[in-house]
Design a protein with these regions (language model features):
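Dynamic helix-loop-helix/coil hinge segments at AAA+ ATPase domain boundaries and subdomain interfaces
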Residues: 4-26
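Conserved AAA+ ATPase "sensor/coupling" helix adjacent to the nucleotide-binding pocket
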Residues: 145, 160-170
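Pre-Walker A adenine-sensing motif
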Residues: 23-35
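Short regulatory helix/loop adjacent to the ATP-binding pocket of P-loop NTPases
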Residues: 129-143
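Conserved AAA+ ATPase "SRH/arginine-finger" region at the nucleotide-binding site
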Residues: 145-157
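Walker A/P-loop nucleotide-binding motif
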Residues: 37-56
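Conserved nucleotide-sensing/catalytic segment adjacent to the nucleotide-binding pocket
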Residues: 82-125
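Post-Walker A helix-loop "phosphate-sensing" segment adjacent to the P-loop in P-loop NTPases
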Residues: 61-73
């Protein structure tokens, strides 16, 4: 009987992002991570399958590789109440549309703390921030930052992504 080895491949950071439609977002994230630009808040939104989670994980991986205290947090499955997040300067918080009352309180506190400390919060949700089922003060905070609707991959981008992942697997 052959046993499977659960060996995860490195995520690839922002190098794993294949996009033509969302190239301005990629360039902005690269500039933020390199310290060439500062934006305290970015909100990504779109339907299931447009890559929100991939964008957030890739940004956190790239930021961490460049010396940021960066964390990816899935608000659908993880609490935002972790002391590590208070010392972070890059938070990638996925699935804001799933925040319950306690999660909204924690997000609001983290958002204000990051802004005060000069950190970055990259967050995502299924809908535009004005349509999120969250408190009005959270919507206001998200509107202070940049907002990006993500586009589905084109056929050419999908092919390029498949080739990149095949190449990474060897």
């Amino acid at each position: 009987k052959q046993l499977l080895l659960d060996l995860a491949l490195p995520a690839g950071g922002l190098n794993s992002i294949i996009t033509s439609a969302d190239a301005p977002l990629l360039q902005l994230l690269q500039a933020l991570i390199a310290g060439q630009r500062y934006e305290p808040s970015l909100y990504l939104w779109g339907d299931v399958g447009v890559g929100k989670t991939h964008w957030l994980r890739a940004s956190a991986d790239s930021a961490r590789a460049e010396g940021w205290q960066a964390y990816y947090i899935d608000a659908a499955t993880q609490s935002l109440d972790d002391p590590l997040y208070e010392v972070a300067n890059w938070l990638a918080i996925d699935n804001l549309h799933t925040l319950d009352d306690a999660g909204q309180f924690e997000f609001f506190a983290l958002y204000n703390q990051q802004r005060q400390q000069g950190g970055v919060i990259l967050s995502s949700g299924a809908v535009h921030c004005q349509q999120l089922p969250v408190r009005a003060d959270i919507i206001t905070r998200l509107q202070w930052g940049l907002q990006f609707p993500l586009s589905p991959l084109t056929e050419a981008d999908t092919l390029a992504a498949l080739k990149w992942h095949a190449h990474m697997r060897g």
